[in-house]
């Protein structure tokens, strides 16, 4: 679907988009002894009121990947697959200029995407110490570009992994 002249994806993302880098803890309660796994995750998200879901569908069509979900009064477009993020989302925003604050956030996030893509399929315990420390630093540095920065969860555990790698 060709992009309409009246939709500016970079402007929408500059206002309502999120380049998310997080360290996650996942516990598998259904498995014996409920093992816990830690991992770095990136995602690209744009949210809007439910009435604007068509705009998010158009963004999905233009970018060429991701999913649009509608829950309650909110629509959410997200790309979570690392291959789609590295191969499609990052190149798209290198070609389409974001507002200054969002551009700085994107550049940090894109560095994180490279590190995670490079280590795809590897256990976190086998990552190089430098890569883990780089992601921790990127996460800390990007907080100043967030509208509502959150305290990162499990960061101490991520730092512990950097000491064993």
Task: Give residue ranges: language-model regions.
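Sequence-level preference for short, compositionally simple segments enriched
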Residues: 1-165
